[in-house]
Amino acid sequence: MNPPHSIDLNSDLGESYGSWVMGNDEAVLDLVSSANIACGFHAGDATVLLKTVVAAKARNVRIGAHIGYNDLTGFGRRAMEYDHEVLVAETIYQIGAIQAAATTVGATVDYVKPHGALYNRIAVDEAQAAAVIEAMKKLNPELPLMVLSGAPIVEQAISEGLTVIQETFADRAYTSDGRLVSRTQTGAVHHDPQVAARQALAFATGGSITSIDGDPVTVHADSICVHGDNPAALELVRTIIDTLRAHDVEVRRAR
């Protein structure tokens, strides 16, 4: 008998490049069901990209193209202005790179998730969102787009015929209207594993979470993002998974 609830857990991986190491990808891949793999623009390089694709396939972890602004120096977290054609081309370029890597090992790219400043920008900016959507439609209109749950991009992408995966964050606080609390605000990040685990459980079961103002709020979740780029974060992910399993929630790929 299948568990009454299931949820996808995703994490940002493949972000090392050259001699610089970011995160503990092998450990995270043992825990999550989806891997957002950097495509070389905000982080990662050709060697790391292929290595991470191989590691994800070996664990039957779903592979996502983690596209970003062309900004290695700023780790893709700096706001940038783009001509429409350039953002379309760079989106195609990045997805194409990871698709090629996946093809060489008999794997497939199953979705696209923007990174950092691009993720935040297209959530609310119709013009940049349109460029990403256009690129995906040109390349593979069947490829789902993972975006912030409840953001304007959701309806925009659906109206253009894309499948949308709505994402929430276990370790981030939410406002009473279901938006992420800015990282500049005190209390924006949950460092207590138990708090993050309770929030993840609510997302997975359709329950309400507690906003930063103490109000109950329900946020739709097809996938939950977890971070595992340091030992403390890995422990948080393990606590989340233990809590989900204790409440009969299965961790598995989003449909």
From Swiss-Prot:
Record GO biological process: carbohydrate metabolic process
Enzyme class: hydrolase
Family as reported in the entry's similarity comment: Belongs to the LamB/PxpA family.
Organism: Corynebacterium efficiens (strain DSM 44549 / YS-314 / AJ 12310 / JCM 11189 / NBRC 100395)
EC number, as in UniProt: 3.5.2.9
Catalytic activity: 5-oxo-L-proline + ATP + 2 H2O = L-glutamate + ADP + phosphate + H(+)
Biological role stated in the UniProt entry: Catalyzes the cleavage of 5-oxoproline to form L-glutamate coupled to the hydrolysis of ATP to ADP and inorganic phosphate.
One term of GO molecular function: 5-oxoprolinase (ATP-hydrolyzing) activity
CDD domains in alphabetical order: LamB_YcsF_like
Cross-referenced InterPro entries: Glyco_hydro/deAcase_b/a-brl, LamB/YcsF/PxpA-like
Gene that encodes the chain: pxpA
Coiled-coil parts of chain: none
Protein's name according to its UniProt entry: 5-oxoprolinase subunit A
